[in-house]
Amino acid sequence: MILIAFLLSYGFGNESLLSQLYPGRVVMPKPVYDEIDRPALAWMKARVDSMINAGKLTVVELTSGTDEFDLYYKLTVNPDEGHKIIGDGEASSIALAKVKNGIVASNNFNDIFTYINEYSLEYTTTADILVDAYKKGIIDENQGNTVWANMLRKRRKLGAVNFSDYLSTHS
């Protein structure tokens, strides 16, 4: 199971790289879905809704009384001493990943790195997904550079000036 926090991988055409790389394994916690339901993110919500309607993404509710809800509550309202409260999207992704043995997909490690380590969670980033797509022949290096440049224009932090540079050190 791949869990999306604030990471929605760019695709080519109408296909998402996530759904191509991880068919049937892409889920979005309901709190994340709720966070993208605003005018400034209408483009992202439209893409998510398209993936949902095509059966390529499932939105998962956190139900009161479940282990994942209890952890979500702890992370958003009453964290352990020395830990900070994190946002609903990050917390729901971490809670589901911990309970369901999923992978957290996020570029926002400032808030969640402590929890990723503490719970020994597997995680991935946009950069990792692009490398995986490249290795599997879903995208070529030029397409990776295009996605990378688009994300940098949106002020995303990716760890290299372009995909080619990242690829040279991570493949």
Locate each region found by the language model.
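Short, electropositive alpha-helical surface patch
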Residues: 116-123, 160-162
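Short hydrophobic/aromatic-enriched beta-strand-loop microsegments
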Residues: 26, 121-129
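Active-site-proximal, substrate-binding regions of enzyme catalytic domains
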Residues: 1-96, 100-102, 113, 142-150, ...
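Glycine-centered loop/turn motif at secondary-structure junctions
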Residues: 101, 119-120, 137
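Long, charge-dense
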Residues: 126-139
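Positions that flank functional sites
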Residues: 110-113, 131
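Short beta-strand scaffold positions
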Residues: 106-107
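Short Asp/Glu-rich motifs
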Residues: 38, 115-117, 135
